[in-house]
């Protein structure tokens, strides 16, 4: 049994998010400066979704997923404030409760990004996200 009050407790929770480096263009829009360099940003969870995952090999019988929308407020290279949100981020995959966990995952990703296949990455993500439900 999943206690949904735990999911509701995630709203407004401060977390740490692994994502691409962000910047602001001259039209004041936030954009991804680098698809190859990831950093850790502090964020706040604004939305929680729990759904039955999807697996290409198993159809609609994949692992359950818990995704969140996070709001990030940070500064760019010039010191100007940047605000953006990231929808559908996976808990324990790109969103972490502690900065130390995010740093460990980022170090792992940086050291293995060129050696893992797409399938291996998805399996690892499914396993880490399933820990939210206590099934991994």
Regions found by a protein language model. Give the residues of each.
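Intrinsically disordered, low-complexity, charged/polar segments
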Residues: 56-136
